[in-house]
Amino acid sequence: MAELACFVSFSLTEDKVKWFPINKKAVKTMLCAKVEKDQRSNYYDTILYGVAPPPEFRNRFKTTERYGLDYESDQYSEVANLLADVLNMVSMPTEKFQFDIVKTVVQVRHLENLLLRIKDTDDILSENVKLRVKAVMIACNLVNETETTPLTESNEIVYQDSYFTITKLDYSSHKLLPLMADEYKITINTKTDIPDRDQTAFAAYIRYNFNKFAAISHGKRHWRLVLHSQLMSHAERLDRKIKSDKKHGRQFAYDDGDMAFVHPGWKACIGQLCGGTTFEVAKTSLYSVKTSKTVRTATNKIESDLISMVGN
């Protein structure tokens, strides 16, 4: 994770907020600077290279002893430039600006994936500036907007129908925060009601073709397919998010769209966590709740249909 302030700084003019990308030399200077404790929440002036992120976020950056953002990579500068460009397009009035916005946690891997989409000249995100702004704002958690298929982070499509798209998420070649994990993302193509029969058919497709994976939600109406062995760690992460929001007086909002394909154990566990149940109790639901009979029947039909085709 990393805060917005790890990539951009700002200045206040008479009528609007002006955003600037932070450069890698400024970050490097900040990491070796001695800063008084009461000044660590402020942006650091490097004198030579402009403003650097607040030193309180120094642990977000990679060093020889620590895993973190590779600020010396080209992708760091590209993400910083992208964020500054998009935030300047949004044109935030000075009187509405609050400093806490720079402490907003952004989705770093999501942003690096968006860079790849923008560079792909065949992708609509390459030319559609309005769509690009919205996609970046979603990745920065700065808008309450559903991440539909046109706005999603990856364009490596592995499945698509009238309502849903599954894209593969490959973070292994990332430079900022590489991650070796097999994951997929599910997004809706449009904001229309999806008939139960189509949800069931999609749930059966996932269960049959992605049987090593479970469909989970972090509550923002898009979904991930993660390995069953990773369910517990994802649930722990969401539990920490719920506790953090409660501690800081924020309302945690969870909306999985009540989709038929969401893993039943995940749905039960997160429902309990949102209701105040301890993680130790709620986690027992992760692997104990069975898939609905309707979805199991639809999955069996896929298998029987395939066997019939082979027989013919």
From Swiss-Prot:
Gene Ontology terms, MF aspect: ATP binding; metal ion binding; nucleoside diphosphate kinase activity; ribonucleoside triphosphate phosphatase activity; RNA binding
Q: Where is this region: RNA-binding?
A: 202-238
Q: Where is the active site?
A: 222 (for ntpase and rtpase activities)
Keyword Cytoplasm listed? The answer is no
EC code(s) of this entry: 3.6.4.-
A GO biological process of this protein is:
viral genome replication
In terms of superkingdom, the source organism counts as Viruses
The secretion signal range is none
- Binding locations of ATP: 107-109, 185, 218-220, 224
Q: Cite the record's note on assembly.
A: Homooctamer. Interacts with VP1; this interaction is weak. Interacts with NSP5; this interaction leads to up-regulation of NSP5 phosphorylation and formation of viral factories.
The record's similarity note reads:
Belongs to the rotavirus NSP2 family.
Name of the protein this chain belongs to: Non-structural protein 2
